[in-house]
Amino acid sequence: MDSAIEISSGSDSDDEVPPQPVWPQTRTRMDPTWLSRRPLPTVDSHARAEHTNQAPPNGASSDTSRPGVSKPFTGNGNTVNSRISSGSGADYVRLSSEQALKRTLPPSFNSPPLPARSGTNNISNASGSRVGVDYERPLSQQALKRTLPPSFNPPPLPSRSGTNNIRNAGGSRFGADYSHPAVSAVGNKSTFGDHYSGAHAEIGIQRGVNGVRILPPSLTHGTSASVLHHAGSSDPMHRFGGGEDRNPDNDERLVYQAALQVLNQPMTESDLPPGTLSVPLMRHQKIALAWMFQKETSSFNCPGGILADDQGLGKTVSTIALILKQKIVSQLKSESSCKQETEALVLDADDESDNAKHESGSHVKPELKVSSNSETSVLSACGNDENDSSDMEKAEDEEANSSTRAFQWKRPAAGTLIVCPASVVRQWARELDEKVSEESKLSVLVYHGSNRTKDPNELAEYDVVVTTYAIVTNEAPNKFLVDEDENDEKNTDRYGLASGFSNNKKRKVVVGASKKSKRRGRKSTNDTSSEPDCGPLGKVGWFRIVLDEAQTIKNYRTQMARSCCTLRAKRRWCLSGTPIQNTIDDLYSYFRFLRYDPYAVYKSFYSTIKVPISRNSCQGYKKLQAVLRAIMLRRTKGTLLDGKPIINLPPKVVNLSQVDFSVAERSFYKKLEADSRSQFKAYADAGTLSQNYANILLLLLRLRQACDHPQLVKRYNSDPVGKVSEAAVRRLPREARSRLINRLESSSAICYECNEPPEKPVVTLCGHIFCYECVLEYITGDENTCPVPRCKQQLARDVVFSESSLRNCTSDDSGCSSSHDNGLDRSVFQKRDFCSSKIKAVLDILQSLSQPDSPNSAQHGQMPSSSRPYDDDDVTIVEPMRLHSSSPSQGAVKTIIFSQWTGMLDLVELRILESGIEFRRLDGTMSLAARDRAVKEFSKKPDVKVMLMSLKAGNLGLNMVAACHVILLDLWWNPTTEDQAIDRAHRIGQTRPVTVTRITIKDTVEDRILKLQEEKRTMVASAFGEEHGGSSATRLTVDDLKYLFMV
């Protein structure tokens, strides 16, 4: 039987211990190089060391001034001064002056036997047992017990007066809880805690090809011999926001090892048993399934990742396959564990068993076992990511952890939570139903609407729960960590740092309750409903959370992004075809959600990613590629697999159609542009650009809208809330009306939901500004609470007011008419027969598609760029037309028309009605049922030829392969949003070539937006190491990785 050395040492001063005999040469730990100078002997992994008890040489004595006390033992007869170090380098020598240290050391130190002494030590270390180190008690009152695994083959202790019964069962793990690193590795900056998280982890020692055991880097002075098994983020050091006291170099070494493993591993595929899915997996989806399953079950400290496949490549099906595979494996594991005799792992404060029960579908709580099967063993030990622990718990003192663990055990263990935009909730439900065979059906709950359940136990009964970001925002625990420097814009600008970063401030907890209420909350752990400001979603311990269209949380400062981070889960996934939309900062929000250390803390993210990019963009982007390689899988439609495209789709042709203004439109635009430029210069001269940022965005918004139609600038149809709003306004005191008007006219009038200047702006009774389309998502039954952090105002139509209704009622009370006018002279553009240049271009395209024999139709409806300006009188009403396909067997040609502004869709709708074209519409003002009905009718009814879509509501997740022509009426700041809209039609299932027409106006702000889009495309391509075609432009080599991580 393997044995472990147990060494007891007192903490008295060195003067109290008599000097050791001459034969052991005394060394102190003050010389950290002594161990590195001593070569480590090779350990035979197949031999059991058997030693006989030996007595020390004559003259050697172990007596001390106190019975049973000796100096710490190094394993070779040498003694060292005990020094306990925290992960941040704190010295606890004085704190440990009265404690006894018990340590077990590996046999590589070649320890001679201890001298005899009195006393009896009976130590039993069962397999997987952990040392009961209580860090809540003073160090002076406890003994630190540590047990090394039997793989170190320690020699037995010498005979002493008394007996030493030492048992260390095979397969034992490190007994110490290394989530509180107490002993630094001698001669190395790394600590045990940097490479082992102790709780729930298997031994991180690997066997080489020749059978020789490979020590971890902390014992080999930084030499990485293999990719270590690393447990999940169960310890506080790995918890959300807990990386600042650690050395990020140690975490980066793990990232390097993971990236190296990905680089060296051949591409593998995985499939489900026949009959599990109703559709076969494509090869690239099999590769995605193998990669995702490996990411969840590997020992890397980030159980999950980012699936960043291009839109339309089947990320949804790959995710469904992952859910099914985990369920199948859990069922097999549960069945095999009942037949095999294994030793249970002691999982500290972990509900993995409950989650395994849920995944397997069994009502009997299976006991987690260590199986001889390698895959099953990994499944049992990994994934205990203890991401269950909320950010609040990271900041609480250790005394509260015991009650927190009790609280965790009360949480219902649920399956997979899928968070997605409201527009694709129904589609996820359909995919989960249609893509899974009858024999393998998953139980699915659409958690949406005002009548949804309030019982978290009911959520735990389903395999999959589908909900929206809005509901998560309101039901997630209302407590989170924030950077104090996030609002410290002046300091970051002053020192040349990016907004949201500070190099000397630490994270703090922002909680609505006071310290007293937090203390009361700790005691109230008997009921899951006792957690304050938390809905059912926040009271469940999820096995897996999947964020679909994860770019929704790209702004890490938003309440939505924070809420997703505070949910408890074992595995975490981000699905996004466009993970970077604006800046590299978009990635930080994903890293924080995924608990991807060390980049989950903004300070580390800034110093290790953003700073290198700013200093040397080429090397900086290569470093970013390596960081992403460990957690991200990305394939585009142009990616090659064995020399062939991963998917065969019809071609996509993108045409840029530049038209010109009419005379009246050009005159209007020039005056608006001159006024805007003059206003901007005034801000610049006064040095108030930053204070007037919202006003500057509004100036740009008006210029962009003028390119679509002048009436948009004049606030066409500017009172969206109508008579209900006016009736509610009349009940408000006059002072309240004035206050709300001032809020709408404020320079900070930015929509709280989309962070853009509001279209059809409205103000709520609580004083918050929204686009009408954005706030309607909350009014129409999804979640009627104001989404602004810590605002609990219930939203309804009678508490949302437009500017016109506020002013009209105010002017009526004063007995005078309102002097406020919505715009400039309306005489030209209010004519019913006026048609803007862009709308004319749209009608021309539809006209060409209605004539199958025309040249334009032969080119899939391509419309040549217009260079002739339209005159005011050049207005034609298009005769009623029917859209036909050049190939009768393919059916009618269907078109999607996108615009950012619902006002523009209103104007286009009027002209399409006059032309007699059957159409449907989808925007954010519609209920989910109405949206779903519009999509079905557009896809199924041959007579419906056109779909009008707002970019906000229609660019995410929808499957619109019935259309083969896409028209973009206006440009968005980042091109990825447009790409997402286009890929609603160009995706798996499309059988015809897709033509895209982007309509712009010459010599306007849109020319400059096009240039900005190209710059952003270049930035995204650099971050992913891709050329514009999607192929890899810069292949990282092993030498690249070593250089980037300074290994």
Swiss-Prot record:
Pfam families to which the protein is assigned, alphabetical: Helicase_C, SNF2-rel_dom, zf-C3HC4
Cellular component, GO, one term: nucleus
Broadest EC class assigned to this enzyme: hydrolase
Low complexity bias locations: 1-11
EC numbers for this chain: 3.6.4.-
Cellular localisation: Nucleus
Residue ranges constituting the Helicase C-terminal domain according to the UniProt record: 887-1042
Disordered, as annotated region: 1-89, 103-130, 145-174, 349-407, 511-533, 851-873
Family per record: Belongs to the SNF2/RAD54 helicase family. RAD16 subfamily.
Protein name: Helicase-like transcription factor CHR27
Gene this chain is encoded by: CHR27
